[in-house]
Amino acid sequence: MEVPREIIEKLEIFQKLVKKWNKSINLVSDNTIHNFWQRHILDSLQLIQYIDNKEIHLVDIGSGAGLPGIVLSIAGVAQVSLIEADLRKCIFLEKASKISNNNVQIINQRIEKVEIDCSILTCRAFSNLNTIFNCIKNISVREKFLLLKGKNYLTEIVEAKERWLFGYLIHQSITCEEGKILEVSNLTKMI
């Protein structure tokens, strides 16, 4: 993946900030710190190839360490809203957002309570599809969802299809053999 030097430098600053804060609040697993660039930065950054127009509003739910939201903002997404219920993580996200030159909004609320419109919704290491779809009832997603999923992605799709209508594409993760990027569109709840 070709990444401009200026973006790499900002992502390295972000990486240092996460490592520093991870000592006091659990942002990422200690087991992944040694492989942070591959496991977290590239895993998040790979979503940029599925964002055709960076002049959009992207919402990242359960933002925690800013993955993928902060990374995508640094990579050029014009407007990013990060939804995180944990106040300590929101304080971290506020500091991390200063690394990006783009508009980053931190929303310290439970996802179910947030009313917002966006073009794209992302999340990583958050929950299964049914839980994600249920908790975003007040979020209007105009274009698509980009969801970083693990080995249980097919089971999640089958279970979600029992309650929801949606189209989807499955993309292979570039960072993990078991990892997938689930691109979801046209989400509608069944009656």
Curated annotation (Swiss-Prot):
InterPro entries: rRNA_ssu_MeTfrase_G (IPR003682), SAM-dependent_MTases_sf (IPR029063)
Enzyme Commission numbers on file: 2.1.1.170
PANTHER family: S-ADENOSYL-L-METHIONINE-DEPENDENT METHYLTRANSFERASES SUPERFAMILY PROTEIN (PTHR31760:SF0)
First-tier enzyme category under EC: transferase
Residue numbers binding S-adenosyl-L-methionine: 62, 67, 111-112, 124
Family affiliation: Belongs to the methyltransferase superfamily. RNA methyltransferase RsmG family.
Described purpose of this protein according to its UniProt entry: Specifically methylates the N7 position of guanine in position 527 of 16S rRNA.
Keywords: Cytoplasm, Methyltransferase, rRNA processing, S-adenosyl-L-methionine, Transferase
Superkingdom to which the source organism belongs: Bacteria
Subcellular location: Cytoplasm
Naturally occurring in which organism (per UniProt): Rickettsia rickettsii (strain Sheila Smith)
Pfam families, per database record: GidB (PF02527)
Gene Ontology terms: cellular component: cytosol
Gene Ontology molecular function terms on file: rRNA (guanine-N7-)-methyltransferase activity
UniProt-recorded name of the protein: Ribosomal RNA small subunit methyltransferase G
Catalytic activity: guanosine(527) in 16S rRNA + S-adenosyl-L-methionine = N(7)-methylguanosine(527) in 16S rRNA + S-adenosyl-L-homocysteine
